[in-house]
UniProtKB/Swiss-Prot annotation:
This is Ubiquinone biosynthesis O-methyltransferase. The gene is ubiG. It comes from Rickettsia conorii (strain ATCC VR-613 / Malish 7). It comes from the Bacteria. One of its GO terms (biological process) is methylation. It catalyses: a 3-demethylubiquinol + S-adenosyl-L-methionine = a ubiquinol + S-adenosyl-L-homocysteine + H(+); a 3-(all-trans-polyprenyl)benzene-1,2-diol + S-adenosyl-L-methionine = a 2-methoxy-6-(all-trans-polyprenyl)phenol + S-adenosyl-L-homocysteine + H(+). Pathway: Cofactor biosynthesis; ubiquinone biosynthesis. Residues 50-98 form the RPE1 insert domain. InterPro entries: RPE1, SAM-dependent_MTases_sf, UbiG_MeTrfase.
Length: 289
Protein backbone atom coordinates (compact mmCIF):
# COMPACT_ATOMS: atom_id res chain seq x y z
CA UNK A 1 0.00 0.00 0.00
CA UNK A 2 1.67 3.20 -1.17
CA UNK A 3 1.93 6.32 0.97
CA UNK A 4 2.58 8.53 -2.06
CA UNK A 5 0.18 11.40 -2.68
CA UNK A 6 0.90 12.38 -6.29
CA UNK A 7 -0.58 15.85 -5.88
CA UNK A 8 1.75 16.49 -2.95
CA UNK A 9 4.76 15.30 -4.95
CA UNK A 10 3.87 17.57 -7.85
CA UNK A 11 3.50 20.50 -5.48
CA UNK A 12 6.90 20.00 -3.85
CA UNK A 13 8.73 19.12 -7.05
CA UNK A 14 8.06 22.61 -8.42
CA UNK A 15 10.04 24.17 -5.57
CA UNK A 16 12.56 21.40 -4.87
CA UNK A 17 15.47 23.55 -6.11
CA UNK A 18 14.76 26.13 -3.43
CA UNK A 19 15.25 24.19 -0.20
CA UNK A 20 18.32 26.13 0.92
CA UNK A 21 16.98 29.58 0.06
CA UNK A 22 16.14 30.95 3.48
CA UNK A 23 13.94 33.64 1.93
CA UNK A 24 12.03 31.22 -0.30
CA UNK A 25 9.11 28.84 0.12
CA UNK A 26 10.92 26.90 2.85
CA UNK A 27 11.90 29.99 4.82
CA UNK A 28 9.74 29.00 7.79
CA UNK A 29 11.64 25.71 8.08
CA UNK A 30 14.91 27.63 8.24
CA UNK A 31 13.50 29.72 11.07
CA UNK A 32 12.41 26.71 13.11
CA UNK A 33 15.40 24.55 12.19
CA UNK A 34 17.68 25.62 15.07
CA UNK A 35 15.09 24.64 17.69
CA UNK A 36 14.26 21.43 15.80
CA UNK A 37 17.91 20.40 15.71
CA UNK A 38 18.47 21.28 19.34
CA UNK A 39 15.44 19.22 20.39
CA UNK A 40 16.42 16.22 18.27
CA UNK A 41 20.00 16.15 19.53
CA UNK A 42 18.88 16.55 23.13
CA UNK A 43 16.48 13.61 22.83
CA UNK A 44 19.01 11.38 21.09
CA UNK A 45 21.81 12.11 23.54
CA UNK A 46 19.48 11.64 26.51
CA UNK A 47 18.06 8.38 25.16
CA UNK A 48 21.52 6.93 24.51
CA UNK A 49 23.12 8.49 27.58
CA UNK A 50 25.64 10.53 25.63
CA UNK A 51 27.31 13.05 27.90
CA UNK A 52 27.49 16.26 25.91
CA UNK A 53 27.91 19.90 26.64
CA UNK A 54 24.85 22.01 25.96
CA UNK A 55 24.26 22.08 22.21
CA UNK A 56 22.45 24.74 20.24
CA UNK A 57 22.49 25.75 16.63
CA UNK A 58 22.92 29.13 15.03
CA UNK A 59 22.04 30.01 11.48
CA UNK A 60 24.71 31.56 9.29
CA UNK A 61 25.03 32.17 5.59
CA UNK A 62 27.57 30.05 3.78
CA UNK A 63 28.41 29.17 0.24
CA UNK A 64 28.30 31.17 -2.93
CA UNK A 65 25.22 29.74 -4.63
CA UNK A 66 22.66 31.54 -6.76
CA UNK A 67 20.41 32.03 -3.75
CA UNK A 68 21.47 32.67 -0.20
CA UNK A 69 22.12 29.34 1.44
CA UNK A 70 21.85 28.59 5.12
CA UNK A 71 23.79 26.12 7.18
CA UNK A 72 23.84 25.53 10.87
CA UNK A 73 27.04 25.91 12.84
CA UNK A 74 27.35 24.08 16.10
CA UNK A 75 27.61 26.28 19.15
CA UNK A 76 29.21 24.55 22.09
CA UNK A 77 28.68 26.25 25.41
CA UNK A 78 31.54 25.55 27.80
CA UNK A 79 29.94 25.06 31.20
CA UNK A 80 33.01 26.32 33.05
CA UNK A 81 33.82 29.47 31.08
CA UNK A 82 30.29 30.12 29.72
CA UNK A 83 31.99 31.08 26.50
CA UNK A 84 30.58 30.14 23.13
CA UNK A 85 32.85 28.55 20.54
CA UNK A 86 31.43 28.52 17.04
CA UNK A 87 32.59 25.80 14.69
CA UNK A 88 32.01 25.99 10.91
CA UNK A 89 29.87 23.35 9.23
CA UNK A 90 32.90 21.92 7.44
CA UNK A 91 34.88 21.41 10.63
CA UNK A 92 35.55 17.99 12.08
CA UNK A 93 33.45 18.11 15.22
CA UNK A 94 34.77 16.91 18.53
CA UNK A 95 34.14 13.22 19.10
CA UNK A 96 32.39 12.43 22.35
CA UNK A 97 33.30 9.68 24.81
CA UNK A 98 30.57 7.54 23.29
CA UNK A 99 31.15 7.86 19.54
CA UNK A 100 27.97 9.24 18.01
CA UNK A 101 29.08 8.10 14.57
CA UNK A 102 28.00 4.63 15.65
CA UNK A 103 24.40 5.81 15.93
CA UNK A 104 22.51 5.18 12.70
CA UNK A 105 19.80 7.70 11.88
CA UNK A 106 17.11 7.38 9.22
CA UNK A 107 15.46 10.62 8.06
CA UNK A 108 12.25 9.83 6.16
CA UNK A 109 10.96 12.51 3.80
CA UNK A 110 14.18 14.48 4.13
CA UNK A 111 13.37 17.07 1.48
CA UNK A 112 16.46 19.12 0.71
CA UNK A 113 18.29 17.90 3.80
CA UNK A 114 17.66 20.72 6.27
CA UNK A 115 17.75 18.27 9.18
CA UNK A 116 19.79 15.39 7.76
CA UNK A 117 22.80 17.41 6.61
CA UNK A 118 23.43 19.22 9.94
CA UNK A 119 23.03 15.93 11.83
CA UNK A 120 25.57 14.27 9.54
CA UNK A 121 27.89 17.24 10.00
CA UNK A 122 27.61 16.71 13.75
CA UNK A 123 28.99 13.20 13.26
CA UNK A 124 25.92 10.98 13.18
CA UNK A 125 25.70 8.19 10.60
CA UNK A 126 22.74 9.44 8.57
CA UNK A 127 20.71 7.81 5.82
CA UNK A 128 18.08 10.16 4.38
CA UNK A 129 15.35 9.21 1.94
CA UNK A 130 12.79 11.12 -0.08
CA UNK A 131 10.31 10.08 -2.76
CA UNK A 132 11.36 12.97 -5.02
CA UNK A 133 14.58 12.57 -6.99
CA UNK A 134 14.80 16.35 -7.35
CA UNK A 135 14.84 16.74 -3.55
CA UNK A 136 17.63 14.18 -3.28
CA UNK A 137 19.64 15.97 -5.95
CA UNK A 138 19.32 19.28 -4.09
CA UNK A 139 20.25 17.69 -0.77
CA UNK A 140 23.19 15.78 -2.22
CA UNK A 141 24.60 18.85 -3.96
CA UNK A 142 24.41 20.94 -0.79
CA UNK A 143 26.04 18.26 1.37
CA UNK A 144 28.82 17.77 -1.18
CA UNK A 145 29.45 21.51 -1.43
CA UNK A 146 29.84 21.69 2.34
CA UNK A 147 31.95 18.55 2.74
CA UNK A 148 29.33 16.57 4.65
CA UNK A 149 29.32 12.78 4.33
CA UNK A 150 25.78 11.43 4.18
CA UNK A 151 23.82 8.69 2.42
CA UNK A 152 20.99 10.25 0.41
CA UNK A 153 18.59 7.87 -1.38
CA UNK A 154 15.59 8.38 -3.61
CA UNK A 155 13.16 5.97 -1.96
CA UNK A 156 9.84 5.69 -0.19
CA UNK A 157 9.56 4.05 3.21
CA UNK A 158 7.82 1.11 1.53
CA UNK A 159 10.75 0.56 -0.83
CA UNK A 160 13.39 0.65 1.90
CA UNK A 161 14.99 -2.65 2.94
CA UNK A 162 12.57 -3.93 5.59
CA UNK A 163 15.33 -5.75 7.46
CA UNK A 164 17.41 -2.63 8.00
CA UNK A 165 16.93 -1.14 11.48
CA UNK A 166 18.10 2.20 12.85
CA UNK A 167 18.91 3.67 16.24
CA UNK A 168 16.82 6.74 15.45
CA UNK A 169 14.06 7.24 12.88
CA UNK A 170 13.15 10.86 12.13
CA UNK A 171 10.12 12.07 10.19
CA UNK A 172 9.44 15.81 10.39
CA UNK A 173 6.52 17.64 8.80
CA UNK A 174 5.83 14.69 6.51
CA UNK A 175 2.93 12.60 7.77
CA UNK A 176 0.42 15.38 7.03
CA UNK A 177 1.38 15.07 3.34
CA UNK A 178 1.05 11.30 2.77
CA UNK A 179 -1.69 8.86 1.82
CA UNK A 180 -2.56 5.82 3.98
CA UNK A 181 -1.05 7.52 7.00
CA UNK A 182 -1.54 4.60 9.40
CA UNK A 183 0.37 2.21 7.16
CA UNK A 184 3.03 4.87 6.67
CA UNK A 185 3.52 5.20 10.43
CA UNK A 186 3.57 1.42 10.89
CA UNK A 187 6.27 1.20 8.22
CA UNK A 188 8.25 3.90 10.01
CA UNK A 189 8.31 2.14 13.36
CA UNK A 190 9.29 -1.19 11.78
CA UNK A 191 12.73 0.32 11.20
CA UNK A 192 13.39 1.13 14.87
CA UNK A 193 15.99 -1.03 16.63
CA UNK A 194 14.80 -2.81 19.81
CA UNK A 195 16.46 -0.16 21.97
CA UNK A 196 15.87 2.63 19.47
CA UNK A 197 13.60 5.62 19.20
CA UNK A 198 11.71 7.74 16.68
CA UNK A 199 11.01 11.46 16.53
CA UNK A 200 8.02 12.67 14.54
CA UNK A 201 6.65 16.17 14.10
CA UNK A 202 3.36 17.21 12.57
CA UNK A 203 0.34 19.48 13.07
CA UNK A 204 -2.59 18.85 15.39
CA UNK A 205 -6.11 18.85 13.97
CA UNK A 206 -7.65 21.62 16.06
CA UNK A 207 -9.49 24.87 15.34
CA UNK A 208 -6.42 26.70 16.61
CA UNK A 209 -4.21 24.82 14.13
CA UNK A 210 -6.59 25.65 11.29
CA UNK A 211 -6.52 29.34 12.15
CA UNK A 212 -2.77 29.64 12.81
CA UNK A 213 -1.41 26.91 10.55
CA UNK A 214 -3.50 27.63 7.48
CA UNK A 215 -5.34 30.97 7.59
CA UNK A 216 -2.55 32.95 9.26
CA UNK A 217 0.55 31.09 8.02
CA UNK A 218 -0.60 30.63 4.42
CA UNK A 219 -3.03 33.44 3.66
CA UNK A 220 -2.13 36.33 5.99
CA UNK A 221 1.59 36.13 6.78
CA UNK A 222 2.58 34.09 3.74
CA UNK A 223 5.04 31.98 5.73
CA UNK A 224 4.30 29.03 3.46
CA UNK A 225 2.68 28.90 0.00
CA UNK A 226 -1.11 28.76 -0.14
CA UNK A 227 -2.55 25.23 -0.19
CA UNK A 228 0.57 23.76 1.42
CA UNK A 229 -1.60 22.06 4.03
CA UNK A 230 -4.86 20.14 4.00
CA UNK A 231 -6.63 20.44 7.36
CA UNK A 232 -8.20 17.01 6.97
CA UNK A 233 -4.71 15.46 6.99
CA UNK A 234 -3.70 16.99 10.31
CA UNK A 235 -3.40 14.36 13.05
CA UNK A 236 -4.34 14.39 16.70
CA UNK A 237 -1.80 12.67 19.01
CA UNK A 238 -4.55 10.30 20.18
CA UNK A 239 -5.01 9.11 16.60
CA UNK A 240 -1.33 8.22 16.32
CA UNK A 241 -1.55 6.51 19.71
CA UNK A 242 -4.40 4.36 18.41
CA UNK A 243 -2.48 3.53 15.23
CA UNK A 244 0.32 2.11 17.40
CA UNK A 245 -1.95 0.02 19.64
CA UNK A 246 -1.04 -3.33 18.09
CA UNK A 247 2.69 -2.59 17.85
CA UNK A 248 5.53 -2.73 20.37
CA UNK A 249 5.93 1.03 20.08
CA UNK A 250 4.36 3.72 22.25
CA UNK A 251 4.45 7.48 22.66
CA UNK A 252 7.09 8.52 25.20
CA UNK A 253 6.80 12.28 25.01
CA UNK A 254 4.81 15.09 23.39
CA UNK A 255 6.25 18.57 23.07
CA UNK A 256 4.77 21.60 21.35
CA UNK A 257 6.49 24.12 19.10
CA UNK A 258 5.03 27.63 19.30
CA UNK A 259 5.73 31.06 17.90
CA UNK A 260 6.31 33.91 20.35
CA UNK A 261 5.36 37.12 18.48
CA UNK A 262 6.67 39.34 21.27
CA UNK A 263 10.19 37.96 20.79
CA UNK A 264 9.75 36.98 17.14
CA UNK A 265 11.08 33.51 17.86
CA UNK A 266 10.03 29.87 18.00
CA UNK A 267 10.28 27.91 21.22
CA UNK A 268 9.36 24.57 22.77
CA UNK A 269 6.20 24.49 24.84
CA UNK A 270 3.70 22.21 26.55
CA UNK A 271 1.11 23.64 24.14
CA UNK A 272 0.55 20.97 21.46
CA UNK A 273 -2.53 22.56 19.90
CA UNK A 274 -0.73 23.36 16.64
CA UNK A 275 2.79 22.06 15.95
CA UNK A 276 4.11 19.21 18.05
CA UNK A 277 6.96 16.72 18.36
CA UNK A 278 6.35 13.12 19.34
CA UNK A 279 9.03 10.77 20.69
CA UNK A 280 8.38 7.05 20.26
CA UNK A 281 10.08 4.04 21.81
CA UNK A 282 9.55 0.42 22.78
CA UNK A 283 6.77 -0.19 25.29
CA UNK A 284 9.15 -2.00 27.62
CA UNK A 285 11.54 0.94 27.82
CA UNK A 286 11.41 3.85 30.25
CA UNK A 287 12.18 7.12 28.51
CA UNK A 288 14.20 9.57 30.62
CA UNK A 289 12.66 13.02 30.86
Amino acid sequence: MSSIDKKELEKFEKISHNWWNKDGEFGILHRINPIRLEYIIEKITTHYNRHLSKLTYREELVGNMQHSTAAYALVREDASSRLTHKLPLEAEFEKMSNDISKLEILDVGCGGGLIATPLAAQGFNVTAIDALQSNIETATAYAKENGVKINYLQSTIEELDSDKLYDVVICLEVIEHVENVQQFILNLVKHIKPNGMAIISTINRTKKAYILGIIVAEYILGWVPKNTHDYSKFLKPLEIYEMLTDTKIEIKELKGLVYDPAKNEWKLSDDIDVNYFMCLGRKSMCYPS
